[in-house]
């Protein structure tokens, strides 16, 4: 599918997730693992890393596990629950191969959730935290805002939904408050932006945020 080709290009060709580390066993949290493309990449580069992946859609999580096995990317913990602000479950829209979201339309169902903050608080150091959770990133980051000091690198895929207020500045403020510098790349291309303020799409902006310490 097109989504996989895009994933592969971003991860293996553009190398958006590569980072430097001197640690023998870096810790990587992959929130929104999808079919496991990013984890295969992490395992290839950081052979001794401790990797924890989260994927809310149990069917996709099983595909992820199979892909990891087929690519010799083993010794990875995959948690098939949604990354959220509590452990009380959440309504989730399944979108097939593209994963799912708490926003938009799709096959709605209740899925199990975990509170990411609790995981972060139990880790003395995290080398890389990836958050690509299709629209839940603001709520999760807000809940984790006092638990980011032990993180060296953070990647966030920000999604702006037409029917909701934009939260990009709030996310950047959380990063600034926690001592991160950041770099942004927009994945949204609009011709004549002032003439295309309304959109039929449920999403009107998507930005990759790279947070790091120097």
Please annotate each region the language model reported:
Residues 1-214:
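Phosphate/nucleotide-binding beta-alpha loop and adjacent structural elements of enzyme active sites
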């Amino acid at each position: 599918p097109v989504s996989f080709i895009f994933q592969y290009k971003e991860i293996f060709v553009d190398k958006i997730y590569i980072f430097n580390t001197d640690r023998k066993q870096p810790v990587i949290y992959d929130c929104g693992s999808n079919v496991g493309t990013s984890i295969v990449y992490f395992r290839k580069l950081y052979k001794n890393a401790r990797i924890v992946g989260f994927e809310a859609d149990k069917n996709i999580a099983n595909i992820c596990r199979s892909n990891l096995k087929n690519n010799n990317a083993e010794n990875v913990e995959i948690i098939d629950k949604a990354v959220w602000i509590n452990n009380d479950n959440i309504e989730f829209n399944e979108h097939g191969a593209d994963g799912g979201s708490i926003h938009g339309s799709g096959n709605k169902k209740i899925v199990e959730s975990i509170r990411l903050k609790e995981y972060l608080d139990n880790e003395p150091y995290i080398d890389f935290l990836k958050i690509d959770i299709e629209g839940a990133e603001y709520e999760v980051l807000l809940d984790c805002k006092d638990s980011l000091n032990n993180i060296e690198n953070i990647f966030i895929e920000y999604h702006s939904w037409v029917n909701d207020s934009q939260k990009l500045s709030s996310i950047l403020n959380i990063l600034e408050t926690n001592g991160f510098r950041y770099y942004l790349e927009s994945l949204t291309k609009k011709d004549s932006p002032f003439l295309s303020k309304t959109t039929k799409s449920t999403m009107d902006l998507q930005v990759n945020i790279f947070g790091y310490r120097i």
